[in-house]
């Protein structure tokens, strides 16, 4: 068994890589179907406020936030609302802001790995970090 310190480091790695993976998944949900092979904007259609939209909601005033939340509530019935919110997220920098947060989580995961001696296992986990940051599906 690993020491408590090593266990805590691996927990931090797992949480960080998991958050990065989820944020990348949220970003990919805004991309076109041809790129991912699955329908886009499912999160909007399911009224899920993921990080790309959340960063936009946090950056606008109260009146604008209420308007965007009302649009989100209509996403299951109106493609126009889905397209509108996608446009807002893209043009207000929501995906870029989310990508920066994802990179911060990946940096945390990589910093954990620096606490370990070089090995094929550490290299495999580092490669996983690269994959999560670059995946497009």
Tell where the protein language model's regions lie, with residue ranges.
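All-alpha prenyltransferase/terpene-synthase fold signal
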Residues: 1-137
């Amino acid at each position: 068994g690993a020491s408590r310190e090593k266990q805590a480091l691996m927990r931090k790695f797992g949480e960080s890589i998991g958050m990065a993976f989820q944020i990348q998944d949220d970003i990919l949900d805004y991309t076109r179907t041809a790129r991912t092979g699955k329908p886009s904007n499912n999160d909007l259609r399911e009224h899920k406020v993921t990080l790309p939209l959340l960063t936009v909601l946090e950056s606008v005033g109260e009146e604008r936030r209420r308007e965007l939340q009302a649009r989100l509530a209509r996403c299951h019935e109106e493609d126009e609302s889905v397209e509108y919110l996608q446009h807002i997220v893209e043009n207000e920098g929501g995906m870029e802001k989310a990508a920066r947060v994802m990179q911060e989580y990946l940096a945390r995961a990589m910093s954990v790995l620096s606490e370990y001696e070089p090995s094929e296992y550490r290299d495999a986990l580092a490669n996983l970090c690269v994959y999560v940051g670059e995946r497009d599906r």
